């Protein structure tokens, strides 16, 4: 028999946005559950140190995740791990069915999608073949395996520069490879990476193939985009940080989204579907930081409380205030 659980709000994903949303809905005395496919923390678990979260000059990613979880649970949010959500559908009566891979159904009149994203792949030959055998998307998870090795880091944003710097703790040499001649990482992050004597920066260059032997990566075939010159770069590992795509597949076909799959919301974080809210890295916005994720989540949780109050009183849902800069 299928297990059915009823709540006032279901939150999909236990990253910073999901746990913050759970904190606020819990404080509003709403029956709240946070469903997480893995472990609480989201991208915090893949980040060694956080230095730009107000109040914490220097905090380990997993420590901040633990603090978030404890805070949310203190105010009544139930966090269920190893509970991947397979689909979210809205009934005619306005209730949502959130179905997990195991077949459990979580029913609620409101849902906040905070499912984050997954790393974007290079889509080059050898990437899948050598995944876990030289190809990685997580420096903290796999960096220690490359002590004394030569490795590549691919990307031009904060993640690529920060992780290249981190990986020099283990690797003897790190090639930081970027397809453009300028980096989009913040200036401070760039300066730190570029000043590291173990890092060699290679610009205007792409990886065409990841090559290996006997089941392990041995080198990468790279190509300069300006000259067309190709060469082999000897390395036993490649860490790929070229962005990520939103985990919105469970709902994307039923809600307004942009070309990349990010969910479009109003100023209260409500999507085009009444009662369905979004926060954090699944939402279409310019910045993707821990601070913006928890800001989104705070607004979404307040929006949920207002939506439920109106629903209980038989009133229409309150209209969201216009977005900043929107025409009247």
Say what each PLM segment does.
Residues 2-3, 7-77, 149-150, 155, ...:
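Beta1-alpha1 glycine-rich phosphate/pyrophosphate-binding loop at the start
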Residues 5, 72-100, 105-106, 168-267, ...:
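A Rossmann-like FAD-binding core segment of flavoenzymes
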Residues 6, 118, 123, 128-145, ...:
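FAD-site-proximal beta/loop scaffold in flavoenzymes
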Residues 43, 121-122, 161-162, 184, ...:
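Glycine/Thr-rich phosphate-binding loops of Rossmann-like dinucleotide-binding domains
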Residues 79-101, 105-144:
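Glycine/small-residue-rich loop that forms an oxyanion/phosphate-binding "nest" at active or ligand-binding sites
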Residues 161-165, 273, 279-328:
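A conserved FAD-binding loop/helix module that cradles the flavin
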């Amino acid at each position: 028999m299928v297990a059915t659980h009823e709540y006032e709000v279901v939150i999909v994903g236990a990253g910073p946005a999901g746990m913050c949303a759970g904190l606020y809905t819990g404080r509003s005395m709403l029956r709240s559950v946070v469903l997480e496919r893995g472990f609480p923390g989201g991208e915090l678990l893949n980040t060694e140190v956080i230095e730009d979260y107000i109040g914490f000059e220097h905090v380990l990613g997993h420590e901040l995740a633990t603090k978030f979880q404890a805070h949310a649970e203190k105010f009544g949010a139930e966090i269920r791990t190893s509970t991947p959500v397979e689909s979210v559908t809205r009934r005619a009566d306005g209730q949502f069915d959130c179905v997990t891979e195991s077949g459990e159904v979580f029913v609620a009149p409101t849902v906040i999608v905070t499912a984050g994203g997954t790393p974007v792949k290079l889509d080059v030959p050898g990437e899948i073949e050598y995944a876990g055998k030289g190809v990685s998307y997580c420096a903290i998870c796999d960096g220690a395996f490359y002590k004394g090795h030569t490795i590549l880091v691919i990307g031009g944003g904060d993640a690529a520069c920060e992780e290249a710097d981190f990986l020099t703790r283990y690797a003897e040499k790190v090639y930081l490879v970027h397809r453009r001649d300028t980096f989009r990482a913040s200036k401070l992050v760039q300066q730190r990476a570029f000043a590291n004597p173990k890092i060699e920066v290679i610009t205007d260059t792409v990886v065409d193939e990841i090559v290996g032997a006997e089941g392990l990566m041995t080198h990468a075939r790279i190509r300069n985009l300006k000259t067309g010159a190709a060469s082999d770069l000897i390395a036993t590992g490649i860490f790929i940080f070229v962005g990520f795509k939103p985990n919105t597949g469970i709902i994307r076909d039923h809600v307004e989204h942009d070309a990349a799959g990010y969910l479009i919301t109003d100023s209260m974080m409500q999507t085009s579907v009444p009662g369905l809210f979004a926060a954090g890295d699944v939402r279409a916005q310019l910045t993707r930081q821990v601070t913006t994720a928890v800001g989104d989540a705070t607004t979404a949780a307040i929006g949920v409380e207002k939506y439920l109050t109106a629903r209980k009183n038989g009133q229409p849902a309150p209209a969201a205030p216009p977005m900043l800069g929107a025409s009247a």
